[in-house]
């Protein structure tokens, strides 16, 4: 019966190596039938080329990381920037694994290499066939997905080249492998190092395959979510081709010319809009009966007239709006809103309704449109302290980590499978924080908040007319939960001499979700629109 020793003892021929052909061999301590590739000129050429490709990939990755914080021409400024970062990281890991484990390729690694290459090919098709991904990412961002695929294809092809050379140098490979002697090594030459390398490369290859599956599913979900039609209109602003979403409803030809302009908070404005839309569409009978409502005072209607024009918009990165270049301050964002309103032919007077961080934006907007703003309603809104806190190092770091991991879509996939979240939830609902566009917008706020945006806000607050009606409505739960929140609300209550501060006990941050909070918002809004504001 043949043994591995018998195989190793076969007579030498013209193909036999005179010296051991791999690193670390000493006087025949390693069997001839090793699965290590010979260190031929082809091997060295492939290795040096892979090292060069790895260096190029790492340099691109570093530039892409810089682009998240400061826009550079390397990719489209409409892109959140995290997708190319993720795919260059994946390409770098693939090349690093090839360089580390090229001495001892194995069957599991070869299988996963081909699976990853196939998955990346599908990724390329998705990003180039999806209209929304082509628009938001641009061809330069999508090119990095193609780069990751080409690096994976390079690894597969070079492995085939080396494997073919190996089989030429070992004509008995197929027979040995078929009889099962290829792995039969004597205890005296047991390759513990090689077993460890085999295990590590197999585990890493499986992990990379899973991560590549995640990137594919995430791209498909992004393309699917992006196909959701936007209510209202998308307006192209500035020369950047960025599109912002603006929706107006109600009559623009009614006797009441006031426009209610709603600014969202930490997520898209649409959860707030849906509540306001229901009230704005209140039947005329209920509208007339509202005069008998308990909170009716001084002929003030607690519901909006059905013909009142209400406009809502999504800030860059929220809802259907594109991201813009970095850095962007509150003032820059408000310039985009002004341009969108001009294109939509929506003029004042305005009554501003702002929720959460949106209070900062509405404050700056009011200062830039002093003659057109009729009043402001702050709904548990932030101010200067909110901008200061947004620049904390831990907050920035966690946002960056979330963005760096966003191409994997862990939260998106988890929410869709286990929590039943729909694309409506991911685009404009409370689950929109899982979007890489949302993360990019929050990074923008954290970068400029403590500096540029804070100075813009302080300047805006100093020029507001002292007789401007301002309503500050604070959530009781927020007042109890956050230590600095009462002081910030007190600061807002001193904006003008006609500021009224209300605290809704036991109301959440989304004040309108409570009955008392919703009634109070409409009461204050009606007082500003129809008259009756306290002097």
UniProtKB/Swiss-Prot annotation:
One GO molecular-function entry: hydrolase activity
UniProt-listed Pfam families: Abhydrolase_6 (PF12697), DUF2417 (PF10329)
InterPro entries from the UniProt entry: AB_hydrolase_1, AB_hydrolase_fold, DUF2417
Hydrolase as UniProt keyword: no
Membrane-spanning ranges: 55-75, 82-102, 115-135, 143-163, 201-221, 346-366
Localisation: Membrane
Domain of life (superkingdom): Eukaryota
Bilayer disposition of the protein: Multi-pass membrane protein
The keyword Transmembrane is annotated on this UniProt entry: yes
Listed Gene3D superfamilies: alpha/beta hydrolase
Keyword vocabulary terms for this entry: Membrane, Transmembrane, Transmembrane helix
CC annotations in GO: cytoplasm; fungal-type vacuole membrane
Protein name according to UniProt: Uncharacterized protein C23C11.06c
Source species taxonomy: Eukaryota, Fungi, Dikarya, Ascomycota, Taphrinomycotina
């Amino acid at each position: 019966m043949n043994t591995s020793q018998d195989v190793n003892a076969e007579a030498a021929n013209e193909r036999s190596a005179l010296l051991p052909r791999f690193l670390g061999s000493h006087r025949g301590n390693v069997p001839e039938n090793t699965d290590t590739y010979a260190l031929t000129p082809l091997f060295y050429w492939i290795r040096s080329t892979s090292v060069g490709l790895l260096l190029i990939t790492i340099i691109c990755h570093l530039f892409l990381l810089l682009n998240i914080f400061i826009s550079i021409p390397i990719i489209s400024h409409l892109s959140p920037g995290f997708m190319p970062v993720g795919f260059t990281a994946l390409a770098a890991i693939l090349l690093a694994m090839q360089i580390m484990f090229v001495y001892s390729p194995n069957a599991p690694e070869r299988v996963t290499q081909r699976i990853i290459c196939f998955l990346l090919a599908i990724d390329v098709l998705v990003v180039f066939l999806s209209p929304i991904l082509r628009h938001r990412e641009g061809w330069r961002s999508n090119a990095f997905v193609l780069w990751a695929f080409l690096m994976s294809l390079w690894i597969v092809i070079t492995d085939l080249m080396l494997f073919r050379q190996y089989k030429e140098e070992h004509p008995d490979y197929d027979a040995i492998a078929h009889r099962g002697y290829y792995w039969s090594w004597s205890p005296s030459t047991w390759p513990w190092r090689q077993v460890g390398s085999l295990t590590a490369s197999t585990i890493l290859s499986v992990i990379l395959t899973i991560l590549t599956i995640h990137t594919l599913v995430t791209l498909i979900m992004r393309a699917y979510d992006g196909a959701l039609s936007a209510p209202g209109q998308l307006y192209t602003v500035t020369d950047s081709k960025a599109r912002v979403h603006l929706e107006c409803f109600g009559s623009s030809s009614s006797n009441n010319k006031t426009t209610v302009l709603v600014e969202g908070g930490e997520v898209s404005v649409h959860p707030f809009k849906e509540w306001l839309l229901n009230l704005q569409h209140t039947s005329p009978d209920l509208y007339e009966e509202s005069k008998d409502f308990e909170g009716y005072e001084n002929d003030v209607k607690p519901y909006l007239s059905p013909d009142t024009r209400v406009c809502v918009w999504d800030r860059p990165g929220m809802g259907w709006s594109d991201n813009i270049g970095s850095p962007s301050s509150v003032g820059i964002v408000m310039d985009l809103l002004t341009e969108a309103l001009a294109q939509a032919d929506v003029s004042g007077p305005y009554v501003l309704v702002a929720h959460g961080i949106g209070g900062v934006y509405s404050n700056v907007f009011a200062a830039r449109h002093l003659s057109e703003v009729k009043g402001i309603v702050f709904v548990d809104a932030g101010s200067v302290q909110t901008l200061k806190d947004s620049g904390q190092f831990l907050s920035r770091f966690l946002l960056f980590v979330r963005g760096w991991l966003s191409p994997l879509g862990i939260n998106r996939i988890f929410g869709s499978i286990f929590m039943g979240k729909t694309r409506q939830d991911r685009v404009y609902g409370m689950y929109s924080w899982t979007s890489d566009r949302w993360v990019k917008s929050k990074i923008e706020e954290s970068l400029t908040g403590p500096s540029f945006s804070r100075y813009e806000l302080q300047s805006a607050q100093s020029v507001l007319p002292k007789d401007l009606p301002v309503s500050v409505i604070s959530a009781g739960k927020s007042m109890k939960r956050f230590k600095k929140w009462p002081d910030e609300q007190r600061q807002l209550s001193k904006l003008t001499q006609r500021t009224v501060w209300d605290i809704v006990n036991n109301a959440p941050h989304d004040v309108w979700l409570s009955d008392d909070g919703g009634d109070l918002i409409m009461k204050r809004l009606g007082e500003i629109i129809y008259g009756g504001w306290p002097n």
